[in-house]
Structure formats: C-alpha cells, structure tokens
Regions:
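Bacterial N-terminal signal peptides
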Residues: 9-19
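Structured catalytic-domain cores with a bias toward divalent-metal coordination
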Residues: 3-6, 20-347
C-alpha cells in the first residue's frame, strides 16, 4: 500500500515534521526588504526592490514556531485568495502566534493591473513558469528570483493560492506534489489533507532540479519544504463562498502547524487523484462544453465540441479515461493545442 493511500498516525506525522524542522530556538525581529518587524508585531507594507513592488504582511509571533508562507496573485486575475489573505492578515493576533506568517498578497502586481490571464504585461511571461528566476533577466524572471531569495528561503511551509481564470470553471482542489523524497512527500501529503479540501491531486511531473524548479511551489519542494497549490474559485469571480473557503484553508494550515490554537477541519469525503488527463483541441475555433465540473465520465464519453468560425463541427473531444471532470472551459475561444477539459483519475 502506498504511503499516500492510508492515514498517517500522529506519532509518524510528528516524526516527519521534526525531520524538516528548521524552527529557530530564539525569536528575533524579521528583517525583510527594508523593513524590520519586531517580535510580537505585524506590519503590512509595499516591499520594494528596484522596480519590483510586492504588497506583503509580516506577522512575527510572540513565540517560536514555523514560518508559513502564503501567496496569492501569482496569476493576477485570480481573486478569491487575495481577499482571503487580506482578512487573514487582519485577524491574526501576533501575541497568540507561534512562529511567523509571511503573506504575499499579490505576487504579480503588474498582471493584476494589466487585467491579464496569467501573464505579466511587461514581458508576457507566466510567473509560475519562471522559477527560480534570474536577477539579470526579464521583469518576470527578476520577480521570481526575488520571491525565491527573500520568501521561499525563509519559509518552512508554503501554499500558493490560485483560482480559475475568467475562462475556467473548476472544482476546488489542492495539488500535493511529490519529488522522490519519501519523508518530504509524505509530510506534503499530510499538509494537503490538512487543508480540508475535498479534491487532492497527486502530481510529480515538475523538475526535481532546484535550479530549474519552474513553479513557485516546486521551488519550495526542490529545497526540501512542503509546497502546495490550491485552486479555489473560478471564472474570474470574487464570490464570498470562495473567499471564505480560501480563508478556512489558510486557517487550517495554521492549526495543522500548531501556530494558532484550533482544530484542523479535515474533509471526511476527500478524494485523491493519481493523475489528471488533459485533452487537447485539434482545431481553432469555438468550444462548447457537453459536461460540467464534478461530472463522472467514462472513457470515450463526449466532453465538448469544437466548431469552426462558421459553426461547422470539426471535433468532438472525448475523455481518454474514466474519472471526474475537474476543469472545463466555459468561454468559446479555443486554439489548436489548448486543453479545454481536465479529467481526474480517482485513486
């Protein structure tokens, strides 16, 4: 039986956590990008380096404990977690906190104001594909380097909080990566379960080279730190239900790590997916979905149709596997090679 297919006992969990324990034995002020945050205090400010600006909150707890990094806005058009982290920053009392919480409220500020799907308008690059970045690179590469150097380096645990863009409808889910380090992979899976999210996707397709980590959370993983990606909310909405959901995920992380008093609300109906199958469009034109998120589909079932600019059917997209629909495009534009549907294979 795989370590990912059974619950881990508390004793083993504590052993796993202790094997990655980098917690300082003495509390000190947090010095971050020009600001000093004393023990038992918090500060929200615009951190700057050169032309890079990052809205951040540093909450330096009164007692020693882990460093939890939470980030939203890696893609500037994914809003619910931005609002959730604003609320979280306001509600945490540093006097009650064990450890330190680092919040990057909006990692891709230029993408946010440029109203772009995933990209940075300064160089048209996807921040979540440019890690660990380069200090002498393009705007996005320099941003990735700064996030790696100043934030990932300080963190013990990390959650990169996303949502579906304006074209995507999705089921809320969390990605639990694995990199071939048994203890790290098991601890990361426990961290994912502690999010309280129902849909947990195992994936190990990211590079394991820290010099070519590509994504924000994989940059943590390749440096020996659990790093999750959450997808909460969709279609570019900022609905209260998704904001509350993301806020509870962040709270669960704090409870799981013992940073705040509280009980982790596990999802008793959690579903673990061994992999996700993406289906590509073979033509450019209009996409019309025939299923929706949460639907159970069988191999060969029609998932959607592609028509040309004149309304002629050119492709029926079918499922290559049996599983659950996790994501589907809800807007018509489709280009050849794009994947408008994702189907999860259930463990």
């Amino acid at each position: 039986m795989s370590i990912f297919s059974r619950p881990i006992g508390m004793a083993l969990l504590l052993m796993l956590a202790s094997s990655f324990n980098t917690v300082a034995t003495e509390k000190k002020a947090v010095e971050l990008l020009g600001s000093s945050v004393p023990v038992g205090s918090k500060l929200s400010y615009i951190a700057t380096e050169g032309d890079i600006e990052l809205p951040v909150t540093v909450i330096n707890g009164a007692a020693v404990g882990p460093v939890l990094l939470l980030a939203a806005g890696t893609h500037g058009d994914e809003f619910p977690s931005m609002f959730a982290l604003q609320q979280l920053a306001k509600e945490i009392n540093p006097a009650e906190l064990q450890g330190t919480v680092l919040i990057v409220h909006l990692a891709n500020l230029d993408g946010f104001h440029g109203r772009m799907l995933a990209l940075n308008p300064k160089d048209n690059k996807n921040l979540n594909r440019e890690f660990p970045g380069s200090k002498s690179g393009t705007a996005t590469e320099r941003l990735a380097e700064l996030l790696t150097r100043e934030f990932i380096s300080r963190a013990d645990y990390f959650i990169d909080m996303h949502s579906g863009s304006a074209n995507q409808k999705l089921l809320n889910h969390v990605y639990s990566p694995f990199v071939g380090n048994a203890k790290l992979d098991a601890l990361t899976f426990e961290f994912a379960k502690a999010s309280g999210m129902q849909h947990i996707i195992m994936y190990g397709d990211r590079p394991r080279d820290p010099a070519n980590s590509i994504s924000f959370p994989n940059t943590a993983m390749t440096r020996g730190k659990p790093g999750l990606t959450t997808e909460i909310g969709h279609l570019g909405w900022r609905d209260e239900a998704s904001i509350d959901y993301a806020l509870n995920v962040a709270r669960n992380a704090l409870y799981f790590l013992g940073m705040l008093p509280g009980k982790v609300m596990l999802n008793q109906q959690a579903v673990v997916y061994d992999e996700v199958s993406y289906v590509d469009a073979e033509f450019t034109g209009f996409f019309t979905p025939l299923v929706t998120t949460g639907d159970k589909v069988v191999k060969g079932q029609a998932l959607g149709q592609v028509t040309d600019y004149f309304g002629n059917l050119v492709q029926t997209i079918t499922s290559p596997v049996k599983g659950n629909v996790l994501m589907i495009n809800e807007t018509p534009p489709i280009k050849k090679g794009e994947s408008p549907v994702a189907v999860g294979l259930v463990n």
